[in-house]
Structure formats: C-alpha cells, structure tokens
Design a protein with these regions (language model features):
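Glycine-rich phosphate/pyrophosphate-handling loop used in enzymes and phosphotransfer proteins
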Residues: 1-238
Length: 238
C-alpha cells in the first residue's frame, strides 16, 4: 500500500527537492551539525542566540515545509536540531555539567543564586490557525531543546517547557513583511499566560529569527529573557 501511495503521490526532499525522500541524507545532516552562537539585540540589551544556520537554501525550505506542508513530517529533524541547540545553550548559560563547555556570551537576566536553577523554555506563540492545523514548529522544537538542555545540565538545574505566551486577538502574520513592518506588527501583539518568578532563567525558542521583533515582544511580556534558540537567522554565517 505504501508503495502504491508513493507511486500516486511521489514525495520530494523538503530541503533539496530530490525525489522519493521526505528528507535526503544530506539535508537531514543539517540538523546534526553544531549550533552557531551569536548575539541579538533584545529590548533590554544583547542576548545570546544559538541557531543552526542561515535562513537560506535547504534549511529555509525545510522550515517552510514544516510550517506549511501537511505531507512533510520533519519531526526527526526538529528533534535532532533541537538537541544541538540545547547542547549549545547549556554552554552559553553556564548550565552544562562540564565547566569547559561554558561560552562567554552576555545572558540578559541576572543568574539565579543557590543550588537550584529553574529554566523555562518558552516557544514563540503560533496563530490559532496553525495550532488548529497542528503545524506548529516552535513548540516541538522547544521540547527537543529542553530535553537536551536538561540531559546535559549540571545537578540542580530543572528545565521545563512552558507554553507561556499567546498572540492577542487580531495579531497578524509576520510572513512577507519588511523589517519595519515586522517591528510594528509585533508591538503589543502578545500576552503572557504566566510569568516566571524571580531568578528563573528564560529561553525563547522560535523557528526563525529575522528582525528580532518577536523576541523583543516575548521579552516584554515575560519580563526578560536569558537566551534565544532558533533554527535559522538571516545573515548569521559569514
């Protein structure tokens, strides 16, 4: 039956358009490379950003397929990429079990004190239409990030995914908007269902970071961020 379906409805690789595979080995391998560490301008100063690469080529097409193609299942890709991002975050935030893994990048909020550190991994909010269709990307990516971050963290670090932010009624899609339009479109567009308490480290996760408008709005409603994780950001890699 699967062969018949494949003959009638052939698939193409989401990344490079090669036939007969949802993701070819070369495109799948993009999720297995180490994440890049950079910074992004937040609303309260620079924030560390970890990303898998540029919003270009196969990686861009994989992200678009994950968001818009009902026939493309890239769950495995998101899980592997999320694991790489989680590993990088452990070093960036100084939470990794090995001190040698720490990376000296500014971390927004002041660090927690005491033996226990609580970390919230918060996905960027999706529209109600995308939630209804089950085409969310940020939420499953956030879950993968949290699993890897928790697995590699030192004792006393507690990591959980908190789906804490929603778009307000009337908020419009950012797709196709220029930079200034994105900034204006995201201002005041979100509300927090719950806010972190004092000392909680907060990581925002989104599939793509472009102008940083979504990050800054999440930072506003949550009261601050420590880091950002994303699949891709334009111009990250020189």
């Amino acid at each position: 039956m699967r062969g018949l379906i494949g003959a009638l409805l052939p698939v193409q690789c989401a990344g490079c358009r090669a036939w007969d595979e949802v993701l070819c080995p070369a495109c799948r391998s993009l999720a297995g490379r180490p994440a890049h560490v950079a910074t992004i301008d937040g609303g309260r100063g620079p924030l560390p950003l970890v990303a898998m690469g540029d919003y270009d080529g196969p990686l861009r097409r994989i992200v678009l397929a994950a968001k818009h193609s009902a026939r493309t299942d890239v769950t495995g890709f998101l899980n592997e990429a999320g694991a790489r991002l989680g590993i990088a975050l452990g070093g960036v935030l100084g939470l990794a079990g090995s001190p040698a893994a720490a990376v000296g990048v500014p971390t927004g909020r002041a660090p927690s004190t005491g033996s226990t550190v609580d970390v919230w991994v918060v996905p960027a909010p999706s529209s109600w239409k995308r939630r209804l269709r089950g085409r969310q990307v940020a939420l499953p990516l956030a879950r993968a990030v949290a699993r890897a971050l928790a697995a590699g963290a030192r004792p006393g670090v507690r990591v959980r995914v908190v789906d804490a932010v929603r778009l307000r009624v009337g908020a419009t899609s950012q797709s196709g908007k220029a930079g200034a339009q994105r900034t204006v479109g995201r201002m005041g567009s979100m509300r927090a269902l719950v806010v972190p308490g004092p000392g909680v480290r907060v990581v925002a996760v989104d599939d793509v970071v472009t102008t940083g408008a979504t990050v800054r709005e999440m930072e506003r409603v949550l009261g601050g961020l420590n880091a950002v994780a994303t699949l891709c950001r334009p111009g990250l890699i020189s």
